[in-house]
Amino acid sequence: MFSFFISLAVLIGGYFLYGAFVEKILDIDESRKTPAYTMSDGVDYIPLPTWKVFLIQFLNIAGLGPIFGAIMGIMYGPSAFLWIAIGTIFGGAVHDYTSGMLSLKKNGASLPEVVGDQLGNGLKQVMRGFALILMILVGAVFVINPAELIAGMTPSSLDTQFWIIAIFVYYILATLLPIDKLIGNLYPIFGFALLFMAVGIFVILLGHLEYIPEFTDGLHNRYPNSESHPIFPMMFVSIACGAISGFHATQSPLMARCIKNERLGRRVFYGAMVVEGILALIWAAAAMAFFKGSFADLSSYLGEKSTAPLVNEISTTWLGSLGGFLAILGVIAAPITSGDTALRTARLITADFLKFKQNTVIRRLVISIPIFLASYLIMQINFQILWRYFGWCNQALSVFTLWAVTVYLARKKKLYIITLIPALFMTMVCTTYIVFAPEGFTFDNLISVWIIDKFPNMNVFTVNYTICVGIAILVSTIFYVIFHKKVLKQSKLKE
């Protein structure tokens, strides 16, 4: 109980205290006109009410991570609560807020443009390709689970394949139409459904507080096969959007083009991430409470079935048929609304690169059709493999974004430590994961075996972490020396 409420207090208090601190560093200017007015085009640059901007941003970023990722993440024990709270306030919310404001200050530029502006043209091109691949992956990954959930609620004649096609038809409309026509009108409904689900699950959770794991129980791993699921780095990749996600930085420019005033940035970008962290916290606790605090039962269920049926079962058992339906609607809406804006972002990134105007439907179709085809083809790959690669790509993108913001703050002679520390940490997470994860380079089967043969007193985890810390330090040093010194030199020349 206490671990849950302490984490909740950190999230809420962090928004008001640390969020305000970050806001001061960013030099917010309320008198400066935003891109919604200076770049208005009736399609992507449109001033929207703040409540709509918040709900759209929240739905854009709240994909599978804060629900499915949080449920898988709680298998690592109370450490998941700790990471969701601290990771959100000092990592994810700062990442989303700073990247959103950099985009806003650069006329609503897409993420590759923002990164390239700080780290150079070479990395801009890398980021364009990287972000485009991630957006297409999101479009594919965030279709399968919603389609399965809807298929389970409808007649057998409307199978999963039917709903996959239906969702893709919706994606096409959401990608092509002006943002205020479909997304601006539909998202608030989905947003309220998602918030209703979170509040409903939270209220029921209050009657099962004794089953929520405590920090005093120990922060050790609860996975039965913990050696193949080490807390570091696996937990930080699994929880993903529930604490920090590079995908969010690709979505923030969409709302940077619709926000009416710079002062609203903290409410929209930082606030939406904090709400997502609260959502992740609720679902992590709910999964444990549903199985009466038994990690073994939760692990067994996830092994036999998956997270989607569990979400359905918790919702209908706790909230009844009507409440369960609204809850499932929110769960379905979260990934679908992330998928559609991901493909919209892919269109905008491609159009920015080609300098291809998007003022007519035909011109938008020219860019969109190849993107949709690629996303549909990728869906034919096994979902578990897709999800793991998505998870790593997602967090790797946050590394690029955090380093870009760090360089920006250094150039402005601001307190860049607020993004430097998260950048260093996430660099180590992503490096460690890709170096010895089964879907990565699996260096633990190569280098570490050789080292242990020479030094038998060392174990495989010590070797792996030492290698990865070394690589992370090397990567960080390269960023610091090449980019940090370069931009400071440029700043001196301008002075």
What are these regions (language model features)?
Residues 205-216, 270-313:
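Extracellular/periplasmic helix-exit of transmembrane alpha-helices
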